[in-house]
């Protein structure tokens, strides 16, 4: 940490580098030895993001800092700061306008005769929107966990999306998160069999995720034009956190109190063993 702080101070006007420092700190602040140290790192992230946004003229870097700063604020419990930062940019009019940018850009490429580029833009947009829907649906389950009707409707609809777009193979990480939350929802209503089904789906997704030594974003036989886009991201196709750190978090998945009611169930104990094998 002190080494990266020193580098941040040394290159205080190199905003692309500072943005990477912010991302690095955010993805690893949990490694700090105590809660106070973690809060200190999060505060440093907020301050450095603010510095970058104040002085950097590169709009892409500026925009990248907003979600990083928002996550740091949330971790610090500064919810009003998150609202102040994001509320205007997330109003329905602006969200609708953003969703049309890819459509307009693809049409422009198509009309100029660049079909290949139009194809790529639309694939990237569809992929991004599908993952956004999947992530939002997991959060939607979390806030409606006490409403079984809403939960079951959401699980049924997103289940069709997962099947149609082969999401356990395309993006097992986000799919695992949804399956995990679905299991928790069913446990909240004492529906153990349904919970076990989704817990099993969760473990299956993790098995796919950790097949290779490195976690990489990738396309498939439908999304054939998105991998060059991954290469343009700051971390390329690689995950922002190392596999070992992800495994540490995953190992504790079934320690969540909601799963206590399944302790001793043969099917659940089998899933726990599979999870343990994955994380060793």
Whereabouts are the PLM-identified features?
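Flexible inter-repeat linkers and adjacent short helices
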Residues: 1-36
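Helix-turn-helix repeat elements of alpha-solenoid scaffolds
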Residues: 1-4, 34-50, 71-87, 107-119, ...
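Solenoid-like repeat scaffolds
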Residues: 5-12, 50-58, 85-97, 122-132, ...
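Generic helix N-cap/helix-start motif at coil->alpha-helix transitions
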Residues: 13-18, 57-67, 93-104, 127-140, ...
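Residue-level signature for tetratricopeptide repeat
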Residues: 24, 28-31, 72, 104-108, ...
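Alpha-solenoid helical repeat scaffolds
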Residues: 27, 31-32, 75, 205-208, ...
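Short coil/linker segments at helix-helix boundaries
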Residues: 27-55, 235-244, 253
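Alpha-helical protein-protein interaction modules
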Residues: 133-143, 148-265, 269-270, 274-280
């Amino acid at each position: 940490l002190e080494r990266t702080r020193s580098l941040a101070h040394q290159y205080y006007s190199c905003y692309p580098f500072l943005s990477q420092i912010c991302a690095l700190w955010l993805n690893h602040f949990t490694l700090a030895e105590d809660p106070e140290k973690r809060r200190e790192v999060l505060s440093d992230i907020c301050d450095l993001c603010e510095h970058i946004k104040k002085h950097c003229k590169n709009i892409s870097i500026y925009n990248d800092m907003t979600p990083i700063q928002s996550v740091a604020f949330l971790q610090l419990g500064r919810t009003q700061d998150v609202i102040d930062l994001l509320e205007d940019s997330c109003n329905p009019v602006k969200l609708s306008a953003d969703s049309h940018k890819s459509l307009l850009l693809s049409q422009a490429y198509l009309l100029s005769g660049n079909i290949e580029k139009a194809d790529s833009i639309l694939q990237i947009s569809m992929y991004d929107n599908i993952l956004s829907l999947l992530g939002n649906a997991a959060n939607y389950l979390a806030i409606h966990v006490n409403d079984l009707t809403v939960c079951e409707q959401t699980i049924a609809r997103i289940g069709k999306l997962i099947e149609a777009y082969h999401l356990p193979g395309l993006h097992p990480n986000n799919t695992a998160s949804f399956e995990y939350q679905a299991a928790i929802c069913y446990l909240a209503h004492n529906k153990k069999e349904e919970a076990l089904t989704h817990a099993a789906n969760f473990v299956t997704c993790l098995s796919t995720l950790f097949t290779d030594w490195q976690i990489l974003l990738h396309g498939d036989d439908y999304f054939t034009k998105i991998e060059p886009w991954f290469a343009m991201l700051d971390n390329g196709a690689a995950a922002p956190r190392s596999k070992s750190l992800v495994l540490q978090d995953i190992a504790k998945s079934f320690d969540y109190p909601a799963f206590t009611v399944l302790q001793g169930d043969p099917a659940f104990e089998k899933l726990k063993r599979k999870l343990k094998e994955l994380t060793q």
